[in-house]
Amino acid sequence: DLPPKTYVKRYFDLSKDQRDLYEELRHNYRSDMFGGALTVESTLARITRLQQVAGGFAPTDEEKTPRRIGEKRPRVEALLDVLEEYGGKAIIWARFTAEVDEIAAALKRAGISYVRYDGEVDVDDRRVAKDEFTQGDARIFLSKTSCAGHGLTLIQATTVIYYSNNYSLDQRQQSEDRAHRKGQTRNVTYVDIVANDTVDQRI
């Protein structure tokens, strides 16, 4: 039998700049809702934009370069606090490429060894990254659930951190199983980083 899973939520408050923009968007979206102007597709798009704000970026289409909101990065600070609290190797999952970029920069500044495994890394380098995590000294495996949530065995990790989530239950379950599968002998802790009073609490 596999060891148990432990689930933890780490809450933080948005910066003032984030909160102001978040509330402005939420007010506008509620007005659209009462006006009957929303479809399922447009509702999901609005939720995505709110999630971008909660992540520290102004709403944008995913293919465009996002703009940071203000100077404070409370979600990053929450992540670093979690890494300080939980030792050993860890997997960090994020939804947006801009978030992965920001996490990578924060890890580098903090002197925390990591590998990146997502669409910004070519296939050969991904293989090297995986080996550096599973067999080498890299402490952090940084990726997106949409890129690495299936097929990989990463049982060296005892902590799995969801910097942000999407609405795919399959991707969530599969990404959890990267560390919790045959060969794992230790308890695995799953930490969700959640912005207070935002869509994070509904995902």
Say what each PLM segment does.
Residues 2-152:
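Conserved Helicase C-terminal RecA-like lobe
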Residues 1-26, 143-203:
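SF2 helicase/translocase ATPase core recognition
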